Amino acid sequence: PLAEFEQTAAAIGAGQLDRRVPQWHPRTEVGRLSLALNGMLAQIQRAVASAESSAEKARDSEDRMRQFITDASHELRTPLTTIRGFAELYRQGAARDVGMLLSRIESEASRMGLLVDDLLLLARLDAHRPLELCRVDLLALASDAAHDARAMDPKRRITLEVLDGPGTPEVLGDESRLRQVLRNLVANAIQHTPESADVTVRVGTEGDDAILEVADDGPGMSQEDALRVFERFYRADSSRARASGGTGLGLSIVDSLVAAHGGAVTVTTALGEGCCFRVSLPRVSDVDQLSLTPVVPGPP
């Protein structure tokens, strides 16, 4: 038995952590020793696997953060360069229309402020800061979102539909953040479709979930773009977000906020057939009532 123990120990020392010593009768000293050693080896293997997994996650997180900082720096550089250029024209007295020049500077500064706000929100979500939770009626939020969208684009046909389903679309969530989810989805539909494209906001229930949908009959997206549309700073058209005043983070924020609420967001689309963004959230009736105590988030 000792020779077999020695061979197993050598194999483990060489990195074969799945090796075990032979089992002997548990009533013998050798049997009890083999049982104890195998238990210890199993714990070591689990600990090493956990450490490797944590290290891999840390590397992935570091890579994502590095890419995020690179993208953010690039996006911030664009409005800064524009502001600097117009400011230099003003300093040199080369601009004929000073009002237009100052308006462009103000516009770029405003866009940069929106970008910084979006970046700070994503940083909070990445850090898993707690949300301020309460009961939220999604029907009321959807109605407000449709009303606001009509005010934003009065020429467009924007409708609200209630989906058939059991119960009410009430969830446990942060009302201001859920309003932002709807606001971003509706703004995305309006900004990236022609005025002739209808936009429909739907709300209801499906099984244990509350459902929100924002659909349009615009040009749609390719499946390749649909797979990446929730990535940060990803644009199906590299010029479209800048042309419409967006930051390229709206759908990423939707994805992160929905995930923070324990839900999921998907998109159904095809070229020439419009887009339908669908948000599924757990209904409040299925949440432990003890968890309804509001959680106040810490400072950013």
Predicted segments with their positions:
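Short alpha-helical segment of the dimerization/phosphotransfer core of two-component systems
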Residues: 107-112
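Conserved micro-motifs of the catalytic ATP-binding
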Residues: 127-132, 170-173
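HAMP signal relay modules and closely related sensory coiled-coil linkers
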Residues: 1-11, 24-39
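Short beta-strand/loop element within the Bergerat-fold HATPase_c
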Residues: 196-208
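Short conserved segment of the HATPase_c
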Residues: 221-233
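A conserved beta-strand-to-alpha-helix junction within the catalytic ATP-binding
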Residues: 27, 31, 132-147
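Conserved glycine-rich
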Residues: 262-263
